[in-house]
Regions:
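RNase H-like (RuvC/DEDD) metal-dependent nuclease/polynucleotide-processing core
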Residues: 2-9, 13-296
Length: 297
């Protein structure tokens, strides 16, 4: 049976990327890194993100990334068909029954499940220009870190690689967070931070007290950068995914083999339990859900 991650890394992957590192002890968890890479379209910016994920994987940490791990299967089939107009390998793009922007081509199966659970519409990886590029960036990143040989079949599920897809907006909705317009309104962002630390009973979550006023630097970053806050949520869900029993793992649901194959191809969003509480993340009270026979959790 796997043990919970001692360290988790949260990556809010976007042009301006938030990074959060949490170190987990037996009774508390400490935020030791919280920063924002201003522009990952530059070589320097991308290297910072890549090095963080490479270090995490090398050390056996769990990583939660807010970015789609794949495209809808029907969309991929359409692209393959366009590259082969003879239809010998995948059929003509015009033979598909779906309309050009039908659900099957626009939304991944995991996004539909996420919407049912949280009521939140995920940004489409195929019709949202800003997201499409990050799907490719994320796949390049996971390929460089994991490689094709090691657990590639389950690579988009994350259950065996320790690199999981997360969606902070859905998690916050499940937790009934007062999100307001925190992406654009700093007052709402500060209110969201206060809600997390005061209303959700996370007294076990603290800031590093390292030298140079690190605690206050971390807190200021969290209160002023929505990317940093999202990265923190990513790191929290990464810890949840690492818990014994793999509570976020799709193997713990009653999906068919065909559905699991679809998740392996398109990706799987790891969601918290459908309850407005974070008690299951308390290091002093780790829940045991039962060992997963598939992923070994």
């Amino acid at each position: 049976m796997k043990r919970p991650a001692d360290v988790t890394l949260g990556i809010d992957l976007a042009n301006r990327t938030g990074i959060c590192k949490i170190e987990w002890g037996s009774t508390s968890a400490t935020i030791t890194r919280l920063d924002v890479v201003q522009d990952i379209t530059t070589e320097k910016g991308w290297d910072i993100v890549k090095q963080a994920v490479v270090e995490a994987h090398k050390n056996g940490w769990w990583v939660g990334i807010d970015a789609p791990f794949g495209f809808p299967e029907a969309f991929g089939q359409s692209v393959e068909a366009l590259r082969d107009p003879t239809g010998k390998t995948s059929g003509s793009p015009h033979t598909f029954s779906q309309a050009p922007f039908s659900d099957a081509r626009v939304w991944r199966a995991t996004e539909k499940i996420t919407k049912d659970a949280s009521g939140i519409d995920h940004l489409s990886s195929t019709v949202t220009n800003q997201i499409t590029g990050h799907v490719i960036n994320c796949d390049d990143l996971r390929y460089e870190v994991i490689g094709r040989a090691r657990n590639w079949a389950d690579g988009r599920l994350g259950c065996t690689t320790g690199i999981v897809e997360v969606y902070p907006a859905a998690a916050l909705k499940i937790w009934e967070a007062p999100v307001g317009k925190y992406k654009t309104n700093q007052v709402d962002l500060c209110g969201l931070v206060k809600w997390l630390f005061r209303s959700m009973s996370v007294s076990w979550l603290q800031f590093s007290t390292g030298g140079g006023g690190l605690k206050w630097k971390l807190l200021r970053t969290l209160m002023s950068k929505d990317d940093a806050f999202d990265a923190l949520i990513c790191a929290l869900i990464a810890r949840l995914a690492s818990l014994p029993g793999g509570p976020t793992c799709p193997y713990h649901h009653t999906f068919t083999p065909a559905q699991m194959d679809l998740f392996r191809s398109e990706g799987w969003i790891h969601l918290p339990p459908l309850a407005p509480t974070l008690c299951y993340l308390d290091p002093a009270n780790i829940p045991y859900i039962g060992q997963c026979p598939q992923c070994g959790g």
